[in-house]
A protein has these predicted regions:
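Sec-dependent bacterial lipoprotein signal peptides
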Residues: 1-19
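Cystatin/cathelin-like cysteine-protease inhibitor module
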Residues: 19-128
Length: 128
């Protein structure tokens, strides 16, 4: 009986931690987009995927994503990233959101955002 109670308590604590990280990742992405989208677009968030770790992204891929995303017309060109936040394992989340320009034209975008393990910095993002 004690084992079952221990396992249930541990599962509950892990679930709460996971929910907290998911919320933190969503907030980080929203803050990042609010800072780095051009001001002539209104952004509304549709959905987010689950937060997932990956060890498949290296510094060259990060640099390539940053360069590619800086060419998009709705993204500011002078995004400041923290290179010290790039570690062997990153966390990623996919976000789908709608941009509405001044004329009312909507564009739905899905992008993947890569973050450090502490969920303090977006280190890169890419178009899906």
């Amino acid at each position: 009986m004690k084992k079952i109670l221990y396992v249930l308590t541990l599962s509950f604590v892990l679930a709460l931690t996971s929910c907290g990280d998911q919320y933190k990742a969503k907030s980080l992405v929203k803050d990042f987009l609010n800072e780095n989208l051009t001001t002539d677009n209104d952004c509304s968030y549709e959905r987010f995927s689950n937060l997932t770790p990956t060890a498949m992204i290296d510094i060259d891929q990060v640099k390539s994503m940053r360069k590619e995303m800086s060419t998009l017309p709705y993204v500011k060109k002078d995004i400041s990233y923290n290179d010290n936040a790039i570690t062997d394992t990153l966390l990623y989340i996919r976000a789908t959101y709608k941009l509405t320009d001044k004329e009312g034209k909507q564009q739905e975008l899905t992008q993947t955002f890569y973050m450090d393990k502490a969920l303090t910095h977006v280190v890169a993002f890419k178009q899906n």
